[in-house]
């Protein structure tokens, strides 16, 4: 009989920095440019690993061996960089694009090394696009004050998975599943109120690059 226990205790902080610049082309056209950075750092805390083996007889457990180890600061978060561009026309049409890069290939894998696990990581990238249109936010016609929204994104995986080629039997690390998503939504202004009811739907597809991984599709 074997018992394994992994326990983590993390207490840490997160620092985000950002800059934004707005340039007004003319009365109706505006461009916004922004950049963000999240500090990558080692998470403060401990991981505890416990393993016990024994035998069971007549309802009693007899311990044969037990080991326990504490690993300080076992995880590290990646540096994250982001940039975005937004175009606004007459406060009615907004179009934006964002790019994000997470430097997972420099993250510390102390916990995996301790477990003698072979792990490889990728830098994760994500590109997102979105748009919102309101025909007239001051119109008396309710339909013209509805905000119509749509968006899409594509992201690469940060993890690599162990893959065995079914033809050759060779084992190697390959990129994990890519992810795609599209969404649509509406912002419905409430009568006699400044509040708004937001309704949206999203389709997500998780697509592996090779056979052996499950393809996933979500609607939410």
Explain the meaning of each model-derived region.
Residues 1-220:
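Outer-membrane beta-barrel porins/channels
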């Amino acid at each position: 009989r074997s018992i394994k226990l992994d326990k983590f205790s993390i207490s840490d902080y997160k620092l985000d920095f950002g800059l934004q610049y707005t340039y007004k082309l003319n009365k109706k056209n505006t461009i916004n440019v922004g950049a963000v950075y999240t500090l990558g750092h080692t998470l403060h805390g401990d991981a505890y690993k416990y393993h016990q083996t024994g035998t069971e007889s007549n309802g009693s457990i007899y311990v044969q061996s037990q080991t326990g180890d504490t690993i300080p600061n076992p995880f590290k978060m990646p540096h994250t960089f982001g940039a975005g561009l937004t175009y606004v026309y007459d406060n009615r049409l907004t179009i934006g694009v964002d790019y994000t890069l997470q430097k997972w290939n420099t993250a510390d894998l102390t916990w995996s090394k301790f477990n003698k696990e072979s792990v490889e990581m990728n830098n994760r990238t994500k590109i997102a696009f979105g748009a919102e249109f309101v025909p007239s936010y001051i119109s008396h016609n309710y339909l013209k004050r509805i905000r119509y929204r749509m968006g899409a994104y594509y992201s690469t995986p940060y993890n690599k998975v162990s893959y065995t080629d079914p033809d050759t039997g060779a084992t190697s690390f390959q990129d994990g599943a890519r992810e795609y998503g599209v969404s649509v939504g509406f912002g419905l202004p409430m009568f006699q109120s400044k509040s708004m009811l937001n309704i949206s739907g999203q389709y997500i597809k998780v697509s592996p690059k090779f056979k052996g991984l499950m393809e996933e599709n979500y609607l939410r």
